């Protein structure tokens, strides 16, 4: 398994013989392509079609984020592993209202269970509400209601004010951290989807759209409590992130370069941290947890096994 690379400095990324080269006025670094799983870009980067063709041939996605750290898009290589049969099953589960609702509920249940683990808030009432919902809007409303409780708890445990969730744009440091963490999680889940036969545009909780890979939004719901909420709490409580790591421009608050690097380092370390996975009777990385979740989803779509979302607390 290759590594995830993060580019935080302006420069040029190119193909150099049979490897990758990043260079600018201060540095020239060759990166063995066999060591690269995917690349996250947070700076101005010059590249050409020769590089893109090379990345495509190696199946390496390239994720782009703008100056403020918002996810803007992915160079998504042509899928090398496709399955018409699985695509048909994905669409069938979207078109069948009950099958779609089951999967949508599952993603929300996974989100609520993992939020319950992170914030130590009883979720029984909300899990029962989820089971009683009959539509996607009802379902999303229940999740949003529980999220509000969690955000109040987030303020308590960090001592930072959230006031209310603001996304476009984030208006304070806590909102900026949530938005940045969510963007990273969406992109990482998309990178893992690429390695499977799943089509990233067919989703169940979030409405499929011509302008986004909405399946990554669905699956990310299960992982955001661990990859975002839990990480934010730890970074603030350990004083690794403070108010000096943010900038504000035009009523928008965002992580500055130093803060972004701190968050990325912690995010990447979490991806590589291992945890015992009972079903396999061995430890796996948090990155592998995403892959295993996608395989469970595939088995459900193929009607080989009923999908049950990751309950992170149950792994402990």
Swiss-Prot record:
Transmembrane segments: none annotated. Mn(2+) binds at residues 143, 206, 221. Its EC number is 3.1.-.-. GO terms for molecular function: DNA binding; DNA endonuclease activity; metal ion binding. Pfam families: Cas_Cas1 (PF01867). InterPro entries: CRISPR-assoc_Cas1, CRISPR-assoc_Cas1_C, CRISPR-assoc_Cas1_HMARI/TNEAP, CRISPR-assoc_Cas1_N. GO terms for biological process: defense response to virus; maintenance of CRISPR repeat elements. CRISPR (clustered regularly interspaced short palindromic repeat), is an adaptive immune system that provides protection against mobile genetic elements (viruses, transposable elements and conjugative plasmids). CRISPR clusters contain spacers, sequences complementary to antecedent mobile elements, and target invading nucleic acids. CRISPR clusters are transcribed and processed into CRISPR RNA (crRNA). Acts as a dsDNA endonuclease. Involved in the integration of spacer DNA into the CRISPR cassette. Homodimer, forms a heterotetramer with a Cas2 homodimer. Belongs to the CRISPR-associated endonuclease Cas1 family. NCBIfam families: cas1, cas1_HMARI. This is CRISPR-associated endonuclease Cas1. It comes from Aquifex aeolicus (strain VF5).
């Amino acid at each position: 398994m290759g590594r995830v690379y993060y580019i935080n400095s302006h420069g040029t990324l190119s193909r150099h013989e049979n490897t990758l080269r990043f260079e600018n006025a201060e540095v020239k670094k060759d990166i063995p392509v066999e060591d690269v799983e995917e690349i996250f870009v947070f700076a101005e980067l010059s590249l050409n079609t020769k590089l893109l063709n090379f990345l495509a041939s190696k199946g390496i996605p390239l994720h782009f984020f703008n100056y403020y750290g918002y996810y803007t898009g992915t160079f998504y290589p042509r899928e090398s592993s496709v399955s018409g049969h699985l695509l048909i099953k994905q669409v069938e589960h979207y078109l069948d209202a009950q099958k779609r609702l089951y999967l949508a509920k599952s993603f929300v249940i996974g989100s609520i269970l993992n939020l319950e683990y992170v914030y130590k808030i009883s979720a029984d009432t909300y899990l029962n509400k989820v089971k009683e919902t009959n539509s996607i809007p009802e379902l999303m409303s229940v999740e949003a209601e529980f999220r509000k409780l969690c955000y109040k708890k987030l303020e308590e445990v960090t001592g930072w004010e959230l006031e209310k969730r603001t996304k476009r744009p984030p208006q304070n440091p806590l909102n900026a951290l949530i938005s940045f963490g969510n963007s990273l999680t969406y992109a990482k889940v998309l990178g893992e989807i690429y390695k499977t036969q799943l089509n990233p545009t067919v989703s169940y909780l979030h409405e499929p759209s011509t302008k986004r890979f909405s399946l990554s939004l669905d699956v990310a719901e299960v992982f955001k409590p661990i990859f975002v909420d839990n990480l934010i709490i730890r970074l603030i409580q350990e004083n690794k992130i403070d108010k000096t790591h943010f900038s504000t421009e035009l009523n928008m608050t965002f992580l500055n370069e130093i803060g972004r690097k701190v968050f990325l380092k912690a995010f990447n370390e979490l991806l590589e941290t291992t945890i015992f996975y009972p079903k396999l009777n061995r430890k796996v990385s948090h990155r592998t947890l995403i892959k295993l979740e996608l395989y469970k989803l595939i088995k459900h779509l193929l009607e080989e096994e009923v999908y049950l979302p990751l309950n992170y607390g149950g792994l402990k």
